[in-house]
Amino acid sequence: MDENLLATAATNGVVVTWNLGKPSRNKQDQLFTEHKRTVNKVCFHPTEVYMLLSGSQDGYMKCFDLRKKDSVSTFSGQSESVRDVQFSIRDYFTFAATFENGNVQLWDIRRPDRYERMFTAHNGPVFCCDWHPEDRGWLATGGRDKMVKVWDMNTTRAKEIYCVQTIASVARVKWRPECKHHIATCSMMVDHNIYVWDVRRPFIPSAMFEEHKDVTTGIVWRHLHDPYFLLSGSKDSTLYQHIFKDASQPIDRANPEGLCYSLYGDLAFAAKESLISSDSNRKPYIGDRRHPIFFKRKLDPTEQFEYISSSSALSVFETDVESGSMDWFVHTAKQYALAGRPLAELCDHNAKVAKGLDRNQVAQTWTMLRIIYSSLGTVSSTNLNHSMGKGSTTLPLMNSFNLKDIPSGLGSESRLDRSKGESRTENILMDSSSTLINNEDNEETEGSDVPADYLLGDVEADEDDLYMMDHENPHAEEQEYSLPQEAFPLRHEIVDNPSALDHLQDKADSPHVSGNEAETVSLTPVESFSLISISHSLYENRLPSDFFNPIVRDTLLFYAEQGDVQTAVSVLIVLGDRIRKEIDEQTQEHWYTSYIDLLQRFQLWNISNEVIKLSTCRAINCLNQASTTLHINCSNCKRPMSNRGWICDRCRQCASMCAVCHHVVKGLFVWCQGCSHGGHLQHIMKWLETSSHCPAGCGHLCEYT
């Protein structure tokens, strides 16, 4: 190969070759402009120095001879964008191409009209591929599904022989020279490190390089026969040469013990055999099953990651069938209503579902949420003002109670006697329909429309304004309680009690008090006490729902800590913006992902998708908004359809024709499993309402179920 020859590609589709051996300042050699879109990869033939291959977003691959000014061959994948192309090291005429739709194609450069083989390698775009330098039939691929797969191409059909799960989309893969099972990878985003994997141990990397501070864009081994030096470039504007002996080994920091719960509550625990055998006092548990497995001991760097096995044991603790049953979870998920109804109906329905599954605490929670957040018209609330009249929302209009006239035994209230420190009972008649004292002068106040500021002024119902009279202890120190006239205007003449205290009477002589303010109402604690009534509520008849938000938040945190993310997420969805701001976004996302994972474990796919759609968390809403691509084959010749229309390029027939209207079905397609004819869903349904025979005329008796 010519070490002075370079090839580059640009986003405008231009492929440029550079000759560093030119004596002039301009090193550009050739320029090719045949691609119409971004060129993702250029690759030289391993043995032919003048043969260059390119793959572009336009779906075409072109082979250039650098001795000519145009391409010598054009290969149409008849598929999505080409992501990578790679010549086989061992096979002169073969190259592999990977595509946006997850397919991999093998081509012979002598036959540009059709690929030799095609198979689906990944769920999503395949970003890279690399042929094994020693084994002719091994092809490694990496994709957006975070997997690296090794395929055996020597068989009739491509066979997956190894699979490595990574933590991010795989951008580049490169086999390590002279190490058959080692492969280097780097990520397209999130993870900036370079990993070297042993495909026989896919769960932890054998080596790791951590020098880059941004996304690694390319990796290559320095020489075809040098396994110790790796070159890498990154978006952090650095080019590193890594020495393999300086690589960190994640196995040194790995935990050799494992713990995992199964879907139905079984607990599996794996540990070293030596660790378990050293515990001589360990007693066998009920449901404890032992299985021999293998873990690897800490590796010496000089051993080049050779396999040395050490015995380990796996214990499985099985739970009782009844106690481990998760039927309640499945039934709850299927029966819960999360949207489409008023809040009160949703809460009532979900409370009924929880009650039917004997989950009384959850049912009570839904009932309380209905009371807290529903409107007045949907919930019968308790009068918070203690109204005595039926249907009334105002205080009863009573001026005074004569404690001597109150019959005993009609009502009781236990309170604490602060002077004696003992509990006692006082009887008070609470009946708004009864007249306790005949006060004709006050009749004009009852039911009147006097403005509230005339009755109360600016005084609110504070605790300091309420006076409790002691009528059971007449021998206690006598004290007169007075009500300033400026707060409660008098409606009739009240005679001062002769037993008033002097220090209260002296208050009228104070120079800081006006004459009107000095006039007071004096009441004897033994005789009676006054209640000044108003014509409107002191309080709103309901507390605002925001008042209870901290309590609801703590309730959801309680359920989540107990492991019941189903209740936490369901309440989040039903309440929506009423409670969403009370819980931080990260906590919500954790609850949603946990619940969605449980739903998918139980294969409740529709409910999982509904939760994603109704989610109030932005990160969760994006889970089902990824682009979905559907690739179809021609129903006549079985050839993959191109993205340029609904007519097959080969047989010139329209794909997916409706048997009723004879137009292409571009949406939902329904077909008969007996004769394979079909069409638009509405057309087929309407046809089968009047006829049981296939609309295509094949004579088959079709049935829509």
From Swiss-Prot:
Binding site for Zn(2+) 4: H677, C694, C698
GO cellular component labels: cytosol; GATOR2 complex; lysosomal membrane; vacuolar membrane
Substrates-to-products reaction catalysed: S-ubiquitinyl-[E2 ubiquitin-conjugating enzyme]-L-cysteine + [acceptor protein]-L-lysine = [E2 ubiquitin-conjugating enzyme]-L-cysteine + N(6)-ubiquitinyl-[acceptor protein]-L-lysine
Annotated binding of Zn(2+) 3, by residue: C672, C675, H700, C702
Zinc fingers classed as RING-type: ranges: 656-705
TM stretches of this protein: none
Protein name listed in UniProt: GATOR2 complex protein WDR24
Organism, scientific name: Gallus gallus (Chicken)
Taxonomic lineage of the native organism: Eukaryota, Metazoa, Chordata, Craniata, Vertebrata
